[in-house]
A protein has these predicted regions:
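The canonical Cys-X-X-Cys-His
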Residues: 71-86, 137-141, 787
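Detector for the c-type heme attachment site
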Residues: 82-88, 104, 117, 127, ...
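Beta-strand-rich N-terminal accessory domains
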Residues: 157-364, 381, 395
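N-terminal non-catalytic regions of secreted/periplasmic and cell-surface proteins
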Residues: 790-835, 897-909
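Short, surface-exposed alpha-helix to beta-strand junction/turn motifs within ectodomains of secreted
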Residues: 817-856, 881-887, 895-900
């Protein structure tokens, strides 16, 4: 048996694994020292400090075949996502290419092991891999890529080398299977995009080649793009621990199918096992299924023809017209899920179940319908499926290859449908002894708590020097439900001691203790099973959550604070099976309208109009409007005081570098792979960003927010940018010249967070900044989730908060007064510029790098603004200004501003 059982659960290393930075940036020479590893030796597990590296390497000879299989499995299931292979680019084309690139920190196995273990540059430390697994990866890379394809990077291992290796007393812990996504208790339903398949299904079709990747032929695949998977057998552990399930597709109001087996799904997805370009499939026996088509006939004409938007690949996406059918939400009562929707003007409640007949599962659909003006028709399953009906108000019939239920008009309907696999005998006889259809209304008033245990976590107060203190408020990772706590949004109630936090794993938590300063927080799980929540907002004390499939409003119906009704406030989302199209952030304008951003498809052209857009949802949830287009991976939304927006975007195809966009309605922001782009693919055909963010400064910007706190002194009213990629916070100084906003970023003087930072809110009670963070894709920071508070303390900041590009140079305005004499020393400044090339290729190198001479530096009358005279200044894609000055107290201050110049303003006075 192989020593290694593949651990696809290394979720935070997936997007950056082995990214050795083969093409060094201007700062790489500074990083190439042991001291610049992300983890220091003191932070490593004890076994790493006494590890028998010689023994681990020599053991590879005895287990060569096993080691190669293990390393290959890891690479193909994890590393390939980003790194690809010689025939296929990975999703991060700038990631290290083992078959052609050069290692920075040494090509011998021990040096590579150190980079894997301790992290370096944009690669996080691989803390969930054991030493055996790490050497298996290294062994595979050496044999598969380095030895023949990149021999200059292949290191010959000999006795002299082995003799010089550390020979400790242990080989680390034994590898073990680790699947936290499959072990978590999600509750009895989980919304996601699923493909329903039976045993013996063909391999997934996946395009290869240059970007944009070709569309696969998926017209016959049974995808539930907004699938609500409901567990129908009894037992603890939630949907993932079940043995039988039914799937409801709330785009089409259809039951997509039912299945039984071990394992629920194969967990192949970016936010499950981390795999890219894939959606999870069901596993086990598929007992019946329905095609991707309306579940109910059009109430106006009785036909099932699908009227929805048809994409380029002939598939149809989005919800049915509201006049046809509309998903209203779902209720929970104990472990029972009650779906609520309308067909025409008819209100429908539906619940699933499972019974047994002759040792075979019988799936049930219990439906309660309000009176109808005319008959309605619902497809149950293909006509070879065994079907029986209990109750009054409806009949069964065959129609065009399907078993169909047709209701009788003018009276309420209360029925239970029994469904068995094709070939099931005697189901009609069994129906005579099956329980009658239940009234579901009594289950829609709130039930007993499903998650009664409240959890607590400690607050670790910061003791850093400087103007900011960072308090760690980590979640209770020892949860009885094995939650991963990948925190993706937060907001506060009128009582500032109380807030709500969502996670990408589908949870919403009510958290208390923010302002009481008791040293701990209390966590109550109030919602679960949602589809990748990535934004949350409290509006008039009501909770709204941005999910990939809908904007959800949470209702507590009985006062226990848990969600009893998940209202589908807006379901206009156009969801496809692509892994990359997250729905990000949630903000509300002064009129009460909601805003979120929807990402485009990675390395592929858009299929639906919503791909790569900023989206507005009306205050009542009844209307959706696309505000701006052309985004690639827009991580959140910021609403500006003037009614415009800020949306970040990530380096990639048509994005030569990360960008912070000041967004205006109706404009296009550069991604030619988004839906219906302009014909002009040059820079003239798009809006320019506020700043092109250099990857060394921030690998992946997330959401911006305005400082709304007098306690933050001179930063009050200024703009902050959060970094998912590097776990940082930046201030964003900017100026506006004509219609163009331009500026830069400056990193706040605080330590990096242990997660990427996703969302931030200022607490109205204590006036401090709270941050929610996670690590799930493309972040260097390894911790799964984190909650933080940044407190401004009574120390001077001396931070640049203003910037201006003029015909004679640059102006930097600081929060505090500076020393005039120190400012005038021109050797204290360096200014570098570079260009980028925007194309369909992933990202861009620096081009036309220059160092500009500063010929004069002076302080203005306010004592806070430095005027730099730079004779050769010109508009530029990228600029980096470093400075070393003194404040008015004589304390040395140094820093770096990275910015973009589109236009030069008036001459410095």
């Amino acid at each position: 048996m192989e020593m290694y059982r593949i651990r696809l659960g290394v979720y935070f290393l997936l997007a950056a694994l082995l990214n050795f930075s083969c093409k060094p940036s201007s700062t790489d020479s500074e990083l190439a020292t042991p001291g610049s590893f992300i983890l220091q030796e003191s932070e490593l597990p004890d076994y790493e400090k006494d590890l028998d590296h010689k023994g681990l390497l020599t053991a590879l000879d005895d287990r060569y075949d096993e080691s190669i299989r293990t390393g290959e499995h890891i690479y193909n299931n994890v590393c390939f996502n980003c790194h690809g292979n010689p025939d296929q680019l990975g999703s991060i084309p700038t990631a290290f290419k083992f078959w052609e690139d050069t290692f920075n920190l040494g090509k011998d196995p021990y040096s590579i092991y150190q980079v894997l273990t301790r992290g370096y540059g944009s690669m996080p430390p691989q803390v969930h891999l054991t030493p055996v697994e790490k050497y298996d990866i290294i062994n595979y890379l050496r044999e598969a890529y380095l030895k023949e394809k990149n021999p200059g990077q292949f290191f010959e291992i000999d006795s002299t080398y082995l003799a010089g290796l550390p020979s400790g007393s242990n080989k680390g812990p034994a590898p073990k299977e680790f699947k936290p996504w499959a072990e978590m208790d999600y509750g009895n339903f989980l919304i996601n995009t699923y493909e329903l398949v039976g045993k013996g299904a063909p391999e997934r079709e996946q395009s290869k080649g240059p970007s944009p990747l070709a569309d696969e032929n998926l017209i016959d695949a049974n995808f539930a793009y907004k699938g609500i998977a409901v567990r129908v057998d009894q037992g603890v552990g939630g949907v993932a621990a079940g043995k039988a399930w039914m799937m409801f597709d709330h785009d089409l109001m259809r039951v997509a199918g039912a299945w039984t087996g071990e394992g629920f799904i194969d967990w192949e997805a970016i936010l499950f096992n981390g795999k890219h370009n894939i959606s999870p499939r069901t596993v086990g026996n598929l007992h019946f299924e329905n095609p991707v088509a309306p579940g109910w006939a059009n109430p106006a004409n009785g036909k099932f023809e699908d009227p929805r938007f048809q994409a380029r690949d002939k598939r149809k996406f989005g919800p049915l017209p509201r006049t046809w059918a509309q998903y209203q939400g779902l209720y929970q009562f104990k472990d029972q899920v009650i779906l609520s929707y309308t067909v025409g003007s008819t209100k429908v409640l539906e619940s699933f179940g499972m019974e047994s007949w002759q040792n075979q599962p019988v799936f049930t659909r219990t439906l309660n319908l309000s009176p109808t003006a005319k008959p309605l028709k619902m497809r149950i399953a293909q006509d070879k499926t065994a079907v029986a009906l209990i109750g009054k108000g409806a009949i069964l019939k065959k129609e065009n290859g399907f078993m169909v239920m047709e209701t009788m008009p003018s009276a309420p309907v209360q029925v239970k449908i029994l469904i068995g696999s094709a070939g099931t005998k005697g189901l009609t006889d069994y129906a005579k002894s099956s329980a009658p259809p239940a009234s579901l209304a009594v289950l829609t008033i709130g039930g007993p708590s499903r998650f009664p245990k409240k959890l607590s976590s400690q607050v670790t107060m910061g003791t850093q020097e400087g103007p900011f203190q960072v308090d760690l408020m980590n979640p209770p990772f020892d949860s009885p439900w094995k939650n991963q706590f990948r925190l993706s949004g937060l907001d506060f109630f009128k009582d500032p001691n109380k807030g709500v936090i969502c996670s990408t794993d589908g949870d919403v938590w009510l958290v208390e203790g923010f302002t009481q300063n008791t040293g701990k927080l209390t966590w109550q799980r109030i919602a679960s099973g949602l589809f990748q929540p990535l934004g949350i907002k409290v509006v008039n004390e009501q909770i709204f959550v941005t999910c990939r499939d809908q904007l959800v409003k949470l209702h507590d119906l009985n006062g226990d604070r848990e969600t009893d009704f998940y209202e589908a406030f807006n379901t206009d989302h156009q969801v496809t099976d692509h892994f990359h199209e997250f729905a990000m952030g949630l903000q509300v304008d002064k009129e009460g309208n909601f805003y979120y951003a929807k990402s485009a498809r990675h390395a592929r052209e858009a299929l639906v109009p919503q791909h790569g857009t900023l989206i507005k949802v009306s205050k009542d949830g009844q209307k959706t409007e696309i505000i701006a287009t052309g985004f690639r991976a827009a991580n959140g939304v910021c609403i500006n005081p003037d009614g415009t927006f800020i949306v970040t975007d990530q380096e990639g195809h048509w994005n030569p570098m990360n960008r912070i966009n000041w967004v205006k309605k109706g404009e296009f922001y550069g991604n030619m792979f988004s839906f219906n782009p302009p014909k002009d693919s040059t820079e003239a055909g798009m809006e320019q960003p506020l700043v092109w963010v250099e990857r060394d400064r921030d690998q992946s910007p997330s959401e911006l927010l305005w400082v709304e706190s007098k306690k933050w002194g001179a930063l009050n009213g200024k703009l902050l940018n959060l970094s998912y990629g590097y776990g940082k916070v930046f201030v964003v100084p900017f100026e506006k010249i004509g219609d163009q906003v331009q500026g830069g970023i400056f990193e706040l003087p605080i330590p990096r967070f242990s997660t990427g930072v996703m969302r931030g809110r200022f607490n109205p009670g204590d006036g401090q900044l709270y941050l929610a963070g996670l690590s799930a894709w493309g972040s260097t920071q390894p911790q799964l989730g984190g909650l933080y508070r940044i407190r401004k303390v009574d120390q001077p900041m001396v931070i640049p908060v203003g910037i201006a590009a003029t015909t004679t140079g640059m102006k930097l305005t600081f929060t505090d007064k500076l020393d005039s004499k120190a400012v005038q020393k021109i050797s204290s400044y360096s200014v570098k510029t570079w260009d980028l090339i925007r194309s369909r290729k992933y990202g861009s190198k620096h081009h036309n790098e220059q160092t500009l001479q500063v010929t004069k530096a002076e302080l203005d009358a306010s004592g806070k603004t430095i005027n730099l005279t730079i004779p050769s200044i010109q508009p530029t894609w990228g600029m980096e200004i470093t400075y070393k000055v003194k404040d008015s107290r004589g304390i040395e201050r140094e820093g770096l501003v990275q910015n973009t110049i589109h236009q030069l303003g008036s001459k410095t006075p």
